Amino acid sequence: MNEKIEVFGARVHNLKNVDITIPRNSLTVFTGLSGSGKSSLAFDTIFAEGQRRYIETFSAYARNFLGNMERPDVDKITGLSPVISIEQKTTNKNPRSTVGTTTEIYDFLRLLYARAGEAYSYMSGEKMVKYTEEKVVDMIMSDYQDRKIYILSPLVRNRKGHYRELFEQMRRKGYLYIRVDGEVQELTRGMKVDRYKNHNIEVVIDKMKLGGTENETLRERLAKTVSTAMKQGEGLIMILDNERDEAKYFSKRLMDPVTGIAYKDPAPNIFSFNSPEGACPQCKGLGVIDEIDLKKVIPDDKLDIHSGAIVPLGKYKNQMIFWQIDALLKRYDCSLKTPVKDIPKEAMDEVLYGSLEKLKIAKELVHTTSDYFVSFDGIIKYLRAVMENDDSSAGKKWADQFIAEAQCPECHGHRLNREALSYKIWDKNIAELAEMDITELRDWIDHVEEHMNEKQRTIAVEIVKEIRKRINFLLDVGLDYLALNRQSATLSGGESQRIRLATQIGSQLVNVLYILDEPSIGLHQRDNERLINSLKELRDMGNTVIVVEHDEDMMRAADWIVDIGPKAGRKGGEVVFQGTPADMLKTHTLTAQYLNGERKIEIPKERREGNGKTLQLTGCKGNNLKDVDVTFPLGELIVVTGVSGSGKSTLINETLQPILSQHFYRSLKRPMPYKSIEGIDNIDKVVNVDQSPIGRTPRSNPATYTGVFSDIRQLFVNLPEAKIRGYKPGRFSFNVKGGRCEACGGNGYKTIEMNFLPDVMVPCEVCHGKRYNRETLEVRFKGKSIADVLDMTVNMAVEFFENVPQILPKIKALQDVGLGYIKLGQSSTTLSGGESQRVKLATELAKRDTGKTLYILDEPTTGLHFEDIRILMDVLQKLVDRGNTVIIIEHNLDVIKLADYIIDMGPEGGRGGGRMLSCGRPEEVAKNKESYTSRFLAKVLK
C-alpha cells in the first residue's frame, strides 16, 4: 500500500495546478485565508474524486439513480483510500431526529428496555405478571379450593356501543351466560345494551366448584376451560369468586393482576417514538402539539373588534361572522366598537369558544322576511377548521401565525405512549434517561448493573458496553451537555459535525480517509484538547485524517500542515507550504507569521464607554437558562462567551433576537420564555448577520444580493446606445426573457443528459457562457459589457466604478469585509458560510445607518483565518464607532480580547450552565475564578 496520498495538477475553482503530498495515517491540517482554496482542494478535489471512484464500482443501472458525479479538474490522485466527509452543512431539520437516534445510543437503550426492562401497570402501579396455562391452572386449584367460581373471557373493556352483534355471535358459539358491567345474565336472542354508555363485558366460559374427591377430573376440565378462555380472551382470563364477588385476572401476556390490563410482549419498536407501536397517540411521537395562542389572536386588547382587534378576522366586513359577534355582544350591553379590555370575560369567552344559545340576526342583514337564528361556534373553532381543512401553503402559513407549540398533555413531552413509559430499569423509564445530559447518563450506565438481578445482568452486559462506548465518544468531542432527546434541528453546525465524528469513531473503520470541515466550530478552548485527542484516536486506528481548520491548537497538534495562499481568490490557489508544524514556524507565510508571533491582532488601548443607554432583558428561562437578567450597554462591542451549551445562543438567538424581530418586523419566530425587556426605544432596528446561504440557486450572486446589480443595470439603461434601442432594466437581467440568451435560459451553460453516465455541464455554444444575447452585449460602458462586469472581481469593480457614486459604496463594502477576490457574478452556491456572512455584512454596511442599529453575529470567525478575523473586526469596530451596537457570540480569544463589554455564561454546559457568571470589561471578567473563559482570557491579556 502507498505510504502517502498524492495529488497532481489540481485546478478546481481557483487552484493553480496544485501538487501536494499527504502522509498516510497522519493528522493533516489544511489552512489558509478564507477563499484561498482549502475547501476546493479537500472537498471539491480529494473527496469528490474518492466518491466518484466509489460510485464507479456500481453497475451502470445503479449509477443512473445516484445523481451527478463529475470528475474534478485534476491530473491524477494516487494512494486514495475510501473517503468519508464530515461537514457542518447537513444538519437534519426533521423533528423526529434527535441526538439519541443520530448516535444510535437511543437504539441500544430501546433494546435494553425491551430485553431487561420491568413492566409496571399505568393504572395501579403494580408490577405486571405473566403466566403459562399450566401455572394458571395450578394457581386456580390452590387459591379457590372448595369455592364456586366462574371462568370468563373479557370481550369489551370500558367502551361504548350496543354490542348486539357480539352477543349474537357468543350465543351462536353456544355460550349461555354473559357478564355485563358486573352482573351475570343469561344470553338471549336480540340482547343489547345502552350504546351511549361505557361497558365492560365478559363471556362465561364455565362455572364449577373446586375440591372434593374428583380432583383430577376437575383439573382436566379446568385445564380445557382455561385453554378455551385464553383463546377467546386473547391471552387474558378472569376468575370470579361467586360467593365473595371478587374478580382476579390471569394472562399469558404481561398483565396487571389488579385491573386486568395487559401489555404486548416488549420489543424495541415499543420504545420508539417513530413507530406507531410506541408513539404517543395524541402528538404522534413529537412531544408537542399545536395550540392557538390567544396573545396572537388578540395582541392589543385596547382595540375594538370593529377596528381589527381579532387579527384572524381583520377589520369589520359585512359578513355573517361579524353579525354573529355583534348579536352576542348585545346581550352584554356591548358592541363591536367596545374595546376588548372593556368587554366582560364571559362575553369574550363566548366570542372565542362559542355560545350554547342561538343568536338572533336582524332580518334586514340577511334579507329575509323574519329574524334569523343561528348558532355560533367561536373564533377558535373557526381557526381550527382552517388549520385542519385548508391544505394550501398560503392557508397553512396564515393559520401558523396564530399557533404556538405546547407540550403534549398526554405524554407530557416524553413522545411515547403510556405503555412504553411503564417499563423501568432502576426506577427510570426510557424517556427519563433521554432527558439526562450525557454526563448524567454515563453515571447511570456505570452503576445500573448493580441494580439488576442475575438474569437482567446477563442480558444487559453487552448492550451496556455498547452504550458506554458511544457515550464516551460524545464526551471526548465535548458534547457532555447535550441530552439524548435534543432535536437535531436545534444543533449548531459544529455540534452536529462532532456528533457525526463521534459516530464515526464508534464505527471502528480502518484504512479510511476522513475529511472534516472546521470541527472546532462552537467549541470552547477547554474542550479543544479532547477534540484533538479524538481526531488522533481516529488516526491511530489506522486512518488518515484531513482537517480544514484555522485553530492554532489544531495546527500545532497536526502531523502535517498544508498552507494554501498566498492570498484569496485569484491571488490564492497555490501551496505556500507543506510540511511539519515545526518547519512551518521557520517560514514567513501569513499563517506562520501569526503562529510565531510576528503578526498579531492588537488589544485596543482603551475600551469604549458606550452612549449611556441600555437594553435590559429579565427572567430568561429558555432551555437551560436559570432566570437570567442581563443588561446590554448600547454603543459598544459586546461579546457573549461561555463553554459550549452554556446558554449563549439561547439567550441571544432564541430570546433577544426574536423579541426584537417581532417588535420591528412582526416576525413569526417565537422567543423563548422571558419576563420583560426594557430599552427597545433606544435602538431603531436589529440585523441578524448569520452564515446561512445568500441564495440556494446558481442564479443568485453577490451582485444580486447586495442590490448593486439593479444599479449596474440602470447604469447600462441610461447609456446612449441603450436609450436609442429603447432598452429597459429587464433587458440586462439574465432571469427574464428579452436580453438573456434563450439557448441556455441565461444560465451560461447547458446540461447534457448522458442516460447511464453522469450529466455533463457544457458552456452554451451560442453565448459561450456570457448568459446574454449578442444585442445586449453590444451595449458597453467604458468598453465593458454587462457580462464583463459580472465576471469582474470585487477589487477590479472598485477601480472600474470609482467615479459612479450610486454603485461604488456597495462594491467598496464587499472589499472592506475582505471579499475583494470574489466575482460580482459568482454563484452563491459556491460561497462558504463565512463568505456568505460577510456578503450580508457588506450589504448592511452599504446601507445608511442611524447609529442606533443592533447587529447580532453568531460565531462570525467560522471559516476565517487570523488575517480574515483582523479585517472583519476592523469592519465591526467601524460600525460601533458610528454609534451602533454589535453583539457577537464567540469562542475565539482574538475577538473576545477586543470587546468593550463581555457577558460570560456558564459555568458548564447543559444543566450545569445557564447562569451569567460575570459581565464587564475583559480585564474584569478575566478575574472570575469560576469561569473557564476567564482562565484563557487572562493569558491573552497579559
Where are these regions (language model features)?
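Conserved phosphate-binding elements of NTP-dependent enzyme cores
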Residues: 1-942
